[in-house]
């Protein structure tokens, strides 16, 4: 699922590392092999073993990348470079289907790199029995009929697993992009899980202004259909080709957007793993159009201190620790650093005639700041690139440190503090709501599908250390510390008490989901109406004090003053709450009711875009 196309696509770096040929090192180099060399040899064996017998050591015929404006179908490609390109457009490509990379993550640290593996025949993949014919085999739930709501238009792009079409919502006439994934191409259980995880992560990141939004997922006998917002402005990659390179001011602006997405993803426990210019689309053709991140097919949920070992990504952008098969979210910052280099110069920082050579350069090559246009680029820009492309991930800048760098700052003003983890920031928001709104969020949370809350479930499991299904004060304290939160015990206790709506002394799974749910979920009319209907027990169209009291009893909410809750929401003072008043309460800013300390409200001024 690593090649999602949402809009027209003519990309030059569109091939996963897993399909690369890694040739053995010459014998006279062996004496000087470093740890990185040994690791690269280990990668060599693994990658070689996954290639088909048809792949040869000789280079394939070249296919020159089409110039902007040429109408070609987007395909997965292997990358070859003949010589250092003057522009991205001079990079030659091989038109060839991608080999699927096995994507199994490991969290156990390894004492030393794997020894070089000998070439061997490719492994046979385990097929899912009748995967392309089994209803509900992918989404694991019954969905509505996609064709009843949307009509398909022209094709926008083609990937290994799916084809993206323009689609129109029949009731509104609004245009969206629909990625249709053929179920017959999902050959393994892992392929199916990749699709599920991609959908889960898109829901988890929903609400960020620079992440493409998912409207819904549908499944029929032959395909899974992902309906997303349509970005008609084309790829960042294409604009780089058209320009050659960006001005420093514009490059810094784009860097803020790209790295801002990385910081937000990491705060939500998501690692993208395939950042490249092709995976950023402009909403429109306008010069100042909003930029959106797409394609979460290789993305993974991660916990602090997790170590991943599967080699995925795209050759020019892959971090050295990924090739060494021991990495974490820092790899995303490396990839973003490569993009910054390209924005400024128009060419990738690490290039070679073969993919093996590209990887060698990634592991050992020097950055070129002497060729044009680098002599005319500021020292501050070069300093940032150097610090983003440090090979030791422990010494590399974090996403927040990049945003604080003088070259990236807006008018010399850095962000005041890193983004809180999603758990902390959302619990702070929840803590300032009155109990009526908390109960309403609980109702909405219980109506969401598993794929919509899968990311929050990962977070709950990370904090619930003893797997009891209940988060204790000590577990919440330890969990927040793991994600970098530095709070006093009194502040943690305030959050605990705010989320513990039924006053049980712990936070159960449903309370946690309600407390950490992104508030964009309450923008949907169907969610709002379902929640209102829950409280309107007699179906009169109004919520009365007695009905609100009954709801409090059902949720185990005690020590609540019904009159005060009603007065906060009842705008026309008729002693009852109609639907419009209920919606106004749900959609306006946090309402400070209940025992939560007002000091927590200062955190809401953080420019949090999750």
From Swiss-Prot:
Region of interest called Disordered, as start-end residue ranges on this chain: 17-133
Catalytic residues identified in the record: 274
GO molecular function, one term: protein serine/threonine kinase activity
Positions that bind ATP: 156-164, 179
Binding sites annotated in the UniProt record for Ca(2+) 2: 500, 502, 504, 506, 511
Residues reported to bind Ca(2+) 1: 464, 466, 468, 470, 475
Family: Belongs to the protein kinase superfamily. Ser/Thr protein kinase family. CDPK subfamily.
Entry protein name: Calcium-dependent protein kinase 1
Organism field: Arabidopsis thaliana
Organism lineage string: Eukaryota, Viridiplantae, Streptophyta, Embryophyta, Tracheophyta
């Amino acid at each position: 699922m690593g090649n999602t196309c949402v809009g027209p696509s003519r990309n030059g770096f569109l091939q996963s590392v897993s399909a690369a040929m890694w040739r053995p090192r010459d014998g006279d180099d062996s004496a000087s092999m470093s740890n990185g060399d040994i690791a690269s040899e280990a990668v060599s064996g693994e990658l070689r073993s996954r290639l088909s017998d048809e792949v040869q050591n000789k280079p394939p015929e070249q296919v020159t990348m089409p110039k902007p404006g040429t109408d070609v179908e987007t395909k997965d490609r292997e990358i070859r470079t003949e010589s250092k390109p003057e522009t991205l457009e001079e990079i030659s490509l091989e038109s060839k289907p991608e080999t699927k990379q096995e994507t199994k993550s490991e969290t156990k640290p390894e004492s030393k790199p794997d020894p070089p593996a000998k070439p061997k025949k490719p492994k046979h993949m385990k097929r899912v029995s009748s995967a392309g014919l089994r209803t509900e085999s992918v989404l694991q739930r019954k969905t509505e009929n996609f064709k009843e709501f949307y009509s398909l238009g022209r094709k926008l792009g083609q990937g290994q697993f799916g084809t993206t079409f323009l689609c129109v919502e029949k009731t509104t006439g609004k245009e969206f992009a629909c990625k249709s994934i053929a179920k017959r191409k999902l050959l393994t259980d892992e392929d199916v899980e990749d699709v599920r995880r991609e959908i889960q992560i898109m829901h988890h990141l929903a609400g960020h202004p620079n992440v493409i939004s998912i409207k819904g997922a549908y499944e029929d006998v032959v395909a899974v259909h992902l309906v997303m917002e349509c970005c008609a402005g084309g790829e960042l990659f294409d604009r780089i080709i058209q320009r050659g390179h960006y001005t420093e001011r514009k490059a810094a602006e784009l860097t803020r957007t790209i790295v801002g997405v990385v910081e937000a993803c990491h705060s939500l426990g998501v690692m993208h793993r395939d950042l490249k210019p092709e995976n950023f689309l402009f909403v429109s053709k306008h010069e100042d159009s909003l930029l959106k991140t797409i394609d979460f097919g290789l993305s993974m949920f991660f916990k602090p201190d997790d170590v991943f070992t599967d080699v995925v990504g795209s050759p020019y952008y892959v971090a050295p620790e990924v090739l060494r098969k021991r990495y974490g979210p820092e790899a995303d910052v490396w990839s973003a650093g490569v993009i910054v280099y390209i924005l400024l110069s128009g060419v990738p920082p690490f290039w070679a005639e073969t993919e093996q050579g590209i990887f060698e350069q990634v592991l050992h090559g020097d950055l070129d700041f002497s060729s044009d246009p680098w002599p005319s680029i500021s020292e501050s820009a070069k300093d940032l690139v150097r610090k983003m492309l440090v090979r030791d991930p422990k010494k590399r800048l974090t996403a927040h440190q990049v945003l604080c760098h003088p070259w990236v700052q807006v008018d010399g003003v850095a962000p005041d503090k890193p983004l809180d983890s999603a758990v902390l920031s959302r619990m702070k928001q929840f803590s300032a709501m009155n109990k009526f709104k908390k109960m309403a969020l609980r109702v909405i949370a219980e109506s969401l599908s598993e794929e919509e809350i899968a990311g929050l479930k990962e977070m709950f499991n990370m904090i619930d250390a003893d797997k009891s299904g209940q988060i204790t004060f000590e577990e919440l304290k330890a969990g927040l510390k793991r994600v970098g939160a530095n709070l006093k015990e009194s502040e943690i206790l305030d959050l605990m008490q705010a989320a513990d709506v039924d006053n049980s002394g712990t936070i159960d799974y449903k309370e946690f989901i309600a407390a950490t749910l992104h508030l964009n979920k309450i923008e949907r009319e169907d969610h709002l109406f379902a929640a209102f209907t829950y409280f309107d027990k007699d179906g009169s169209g109004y919520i009365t004090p007695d009905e609100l009291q009954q709801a409090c009893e059902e949720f185990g909410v005690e020590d609540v003053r019904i009159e005060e809750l009603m007065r906060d929401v009842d705008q026309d003072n008729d002693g009852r709450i109609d639907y419009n008043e209920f919606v106004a309460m749900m959609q306006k800013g946090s309402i400070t009711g209940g025992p939560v300390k007002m000091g927590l409200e200062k955190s809401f001024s953080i420019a949090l875009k999750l």
